[in-house]
């Protein structure tokens, strides 16, 4: 989701991590690379490593964190201690397979008190989240859809669109809402695969491009190839900051959380758990991270340390979050093959 390139193992070194040269513990984090690592280092790890006399290092696996954790389990050689910004579908899938460590009852309760129950799962908490939102080019459209039902209404809005060609659970959540499911029910209602694919089939003739990355979203909207589409919220606001005239509609969008979690069987699970507790309890540090990356952080107090211009663009801002539909990740963890296959067939058909 962050568009980082390549899979590169990066040890940031003792000095960079801010730990003592006498450190004997190395905390290994499966990350995304690029600006995500840089922000995590600056906002969290410099202080955390120094206070706990350890060294943190990243192994970057953008978009393939799930595969890496599965491979480590298959080989019975767990190399990572924690994962940074693991996408929701992958996180719930790994947890369902017993490959992410469950939170203790007391830790979960503490996180819920600090962050709010909606941000906390049995295995961690959301971090680096965004929204899959309706975006239209106001230079090319006088009136924009204001709900997902309108976005799917091709008679009212016949313009060509772009839509996600990846992340099926996010895509079908927009279809559920367009078909009339309240956004408060998407997280707990089992997905009717045939019904959502039928809804998507009605939209497909008006989809000109199925995007595969954030960079492609921006390229298509910047070029004017389509005036309307579903975009990642952070990518849309980046275009606006560059002068592209876009309207962002949060209403009925799909919430796309990522998660911090501890890998089950990690060699340094205690230190990894301590890192999660550090992040959750340091809203100012979260604000630093969000200001660098422009993606959301879980502690609501972090908004106090952000310019309003940035805070208003984050998915976890209460004004935005209450307008988003959360996918049923628990269902997806048990039915990912079924949905992924159905979505691939939809794209090819």
Language-model features: locations:
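Bacterial signal peptide processing site
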Residues: 18-20
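C-terminal motif of bacterial Sec signal peptides marking the signal peptidase cleavage site
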Residues: 13-16
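Early extracytoplasmic/lumenal segment of secretory-pathway proteins
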Residues: 23-92
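Extracytoplasmic ligand-binding site segments that recognize negatively charged/polar headgroups
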Residues: 32-41, 78-225
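Mature extracytoplasmic/periplasmic domains
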Residues: 263-323
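A ligand-binding cleft/hinge motif common to bilobed small-molecule-binding domains
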Residues: 89-93, 222, 228-245
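Periplasmic-binding protein-like
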Residues: 130, 194-203, 240-266
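A bilobed periplasmic-binding-protein/Venus flytrap-type ligand-binding module shared by bacterial periplasmic
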Residues: 133-140, 176-180, 257-271, 288-291
């Amino acid at each position: 989701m962050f568009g980082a390139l390549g899979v590169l193992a990066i040890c940031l070194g003792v000095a960079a991590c801010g730990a003592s040269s006498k450190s004997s513990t190395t905390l290994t984090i499966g990350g995304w690379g690029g600006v995500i690592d840089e922000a995590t280092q600056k906002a969290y790890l410099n202080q955390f490593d120094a206070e706990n006399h350890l060294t943190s290092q990243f192994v970057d696996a953008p978009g393939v964190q799930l595969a890496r954790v599965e491979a480590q389990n298959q080989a019975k050689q767990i190399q990572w201690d924690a994962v940074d910004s693991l996408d929701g579908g992958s996180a719930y899938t790994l947890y369902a397979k017993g490959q992410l460590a469950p939170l203790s009852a007391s830790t979960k309760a503490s996180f819920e008190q600090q962050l709010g129950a909606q941000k906390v799962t049995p295995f961690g908490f959301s971090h680096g989240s965004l929204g899959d939102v309706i975006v239209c080019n106001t230079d090319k459209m006088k009136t924009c859809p204001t709900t997902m039902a309108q976005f799917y209404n091709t008679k009212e809005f016949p313009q060509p669109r772009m839509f996600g060609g990846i992340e099926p659970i996010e895509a079908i959540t927009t279809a559920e809402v367009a078909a009339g499911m309240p956004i408060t029910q998407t997280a707990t209602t089992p997905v009717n695969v045939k019904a959502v694919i039928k809804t998507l089939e009605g939209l497909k003739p008006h989809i000109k491009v199925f995007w595969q990355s954030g960079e492609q979203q921006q390229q298509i909207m910047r070029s004017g190839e389509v005036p309307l589409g579903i975009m990642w919220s952070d990518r849309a606001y980046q275009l606006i900051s560059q002068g592209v005239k876009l309207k962002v509609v949060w209403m009925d969008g799909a919430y796309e959380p990522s998660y911090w979690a501890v890998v089950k069987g990690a060699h340094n699970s205690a230190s990894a758990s301590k890192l999660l507790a550090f992040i959750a309890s340091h809203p100012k540090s979260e604000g630093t991270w969000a200001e660098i990356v422009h993606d959301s952080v879980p502690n609501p107090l972090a908004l106090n340390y952000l310019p309003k211009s940035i805070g208003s663009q984050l998915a976890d801002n209460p004004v935005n979050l209450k307008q988003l539909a959360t996918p049923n990740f628990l269902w997806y963890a048990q039915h990912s093959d079924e949905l992924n296959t159905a979505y691939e067939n939809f794209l090819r058909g």
